[in-house]
Regions:
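Catalytic-core regions of core metabolic enzymes
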Residues: 1-188
């Protein structure tokens, strides 16, 4: 636990000789204080129970974030020698994740950042994206990422553009994403 990311359970299923990852998932899903579940996952030893837990998470709108290891052929062979686990075909696992709305991440930093998003009481809503930056470079970086992920920017309506134009420095365009360079102190 830290000030930025709190846990109500941190557990290692180890070789899953008595308690499986799916058992821990189910236990967390029965708790009222569970906002998200993050898994560092080598293999799925009980596919039926695992899928049932994914379905339960989806029904309760509990986000699942999974860092799956053993994705490469070499990594999968190491899983066998580490715990006797068969890592399985990663494309099949990805399809399972996509079907159940699971967020698959590639490293611990991405996992922590993703889980922090769900720690907040506010829920993200579907729709288009709007953003404001104090740096044109950051604006370009986020735009490149958004385009790569097929995320659409929202179009600003005329009244929003008019309001922004009254506060922006000359030369800055009232558009989404917005470059606030030098004007950020005029907005609350």
């Amino acid at each position: 636990n830290s000030r930025r990311l709190g846990f109500n359970l941190c557990a290692s299923a180890g070789d899953e000789m008595t308690t499986t990852v799916a058992d821990y998932m189910d236990w967390c899903l029965e708790r009222d204080d569970t906002r998200a579940i993050g898994l560092f996952l080598e293999t799925v030893r009980d596919p039926e129970q695992f899928v049932a837990a994914l379905e339960k998470a989806s029904a309760r709108a509990i986000p699942m974030v999974i860092l799956k290891i053993g994705k490469s052929a070499l990594g999968a062979s190491m899983a066998i020698t580490h715990t006797g686990a068969i890592a399985g075909n990663h494309a099949v696992f990805q399809a399972l994740c996509q079907r159940h709305g699971v967020i698959e991440v590639d490293d611990f930093d991405e996992m922590a950042a993703t889980l922090m998003l769900f720690q907040n009481e506010r829920k993200a809503v579907s729709g288009k994206f709007a953003a404001a930056f104090e740096s044109g470079g950051f604006r370009e970086l986020v735009t490149d990422t958004a385009v790569g992920l097929d995320i659409e920017y929202a179009t600003l309506d005329a009244s929003t553009v008019n309001t922004l134009e009254q506060h922006l420095d000359p030369g800055l365009k009232a558009e989404n994403p917005l470059d606030l360079w030098g004007s950020h102190d005029r907005f609350e």
